[in-house]
Amino acid sequence: IAAVICCATFPMWNAYPAIFANLATGNSAIVKPHPNGILPVAIAIRTMRKVLSDNGYAPNVLIMTADTRGDPVTIELLQHPEIPIIDYTGSQRFGIWIEENCAQKLVYTETAGCNGVIIESTENIDGLINALANGLCGFSAQMCTSPQNIHIPEHGFETNVGQISFDGFKDLLVDAINERVADPKRAAALCGAIQADESLAILDQLRNEDKASIALESFPYDHPEFPFARTASPLVLTVKPELRELYNKEHFAPVAFLIREKNPESALANATSLVRESGAISSYLYSSNKAFTEKAKDAFADAGA
């Protein structure tokens, strides 16, 4: 029997492959949704149980168990002696707990990391800015692949339109984000909503940090379909590289750090060091320099990105 633990933001994103892999190999599965995401999981499980039944299989090879924040059952489920397989998607903190306390079982975890972007040079500055703006806005940066830390040389970088300064890059990025969130209808389609009050609390904490400068303030927008939804546009902060305590972990909120690095080599060293310390599910590089690109690919691979 496998336990499949779902996350709050994308309840079935990783659950589907885990469920199908277990059923295909003859394992039953108990699916445990996050308390904030019970309904979509229940709908999916009901549908899959019907498909099993319609095709002559016992539907109880797939069941769901739900809980609440006040009365959780996850740890009890994971530690049950008849659960030898665990598939978990969620916070890094609880993922580490599972890896340390359920090491005798077959454990798969997909948690989070410090996803970094290094900018060394580009032959398409418009494409770079648009891609970053979309990534920072998309799903309000609540995806495990969302970029967070953007490492930029303090003296700027070469582009197809000439040298662009650190501040020039910052202004281009801020303008692109503002363009995407100015219209609530477009903002809602791209950013969606904030799934938990904790994310709004993170924004409040970071915007009040004395050591960071606000390049772009975050604000709520009126969701055209869900008037009571939590919403927030991206918060963009500029920081010095030595202030690692501000950006050396995943902040589960729409926030990005523009890190003023000494040069591309320092940016690469800092970004890969963060991968070693905090992990990274996605790492990004913009460079038209083939030698630097190869160096960065090797460095990220060695760091475990």
Where do the model's predicted regions map?
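Rossmann-like NAD(P) dinucleotide-binding subdomain of oxidoreductase/dehydrogenase enzymes
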Residues: I1-I129
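Structured core elements
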Residues: A3-V4, I30, M64, D87-Y88, ...
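ALDH superfamily catalytic-core signature
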Residues: Y16, T47-G56, R93-P241
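Short, solvent-exposed amphipathic alpha-helical segments in soluble enzyme
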Residues: A18-A21, C102-Q104, N134-G135, T272-R276, ...
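A structural micro-motif
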Residues: N27, N60, K105-L106, A212, ...
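Conserved short loop/turn motifs at secondary-structure junctions
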Residues: N36-G37, M64-R69, Q148-F157, A187-Q195, ...
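Conserved C-terminal structural/oligomerization subdomain of aldehyde/semialdehyde dehydrogenase
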Residues: N55-Y57, P153, G168, P224-A305
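Short glycine-enriched loop/turn motifs at secondary-structure junctions
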Residues: P59, H80, T111-G113, C144, ...
